[in-house]
Amino acid sequence: MMEEQIRARRLPPLFDGEVNAQNFDEWRKNIVDLYAHECFGVTPPAPREVRAVVAEQNDDDWAGKAEHRKVMLSFDMENGEFSFPVHLVIPKAGRSCPCVVYPSFTPYATAGYQPIEEIVDQGFALAVFCYEDVTRDNEDFTDGLAAMTSRGAADDWGKIGMWAFACSRVLDHLLTLPEIDGSRVA
């Protein structure tokens, strides 16, 4: 029954031929392009540079187990500069730590359960930002990162893509920090 419904929709083929080790990269690119153009929108290219300014720092946070930095990340977009705050919590481990990028529904450590201390206790760093500091979850594309690019094409990027883009900019910054093991970021 489902196969009949799919045939009736006359969908384009996802890939001509069989997927194997030799053509996997091409197949993956086709799938990513389909999702971009038909579902989530096309994400603009990464900026040339991500700038970071430490706005606040506490070297003895979370019961003395970690350093906390509030960092303002900024980068240039089509319609100007965009910046948003990221809170970095880095364990006092004496070595490079794995890190979790955590787009939060609430501002840093203000409401609800955020397992920051538990994560630090396991030797992981944490990079937390509130999704609303990037762009609000509504149909308005005039605030935050949403205002930084022109709109009008059918495959313009959406809010999920913008939050993912922000996660990537956080990663760009994390990769510059010796305290973070850049090969172990989730």
Regions found by a protein language model. Name each.
Residues 79-84, 90-99, 122:
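Proline/glycine-enriched tight loop/beta-turn segments at coil->beta junctions
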Residues 1-83:
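N-terminal targeting or regulatory segments adjacent to alpha/beta-hydrolase or S9 domains
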Residues 95, 99-186:
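Cap/lid segment of the alpha/beta-hydrolase catalytic domain
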Residues 74-76, 89, 104:
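Solvent-exposed residues in well-ordered beta-strands and their adjoining turns
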Residues 15-16, 27, 84, 97, ...:
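Aromatic-residue detector
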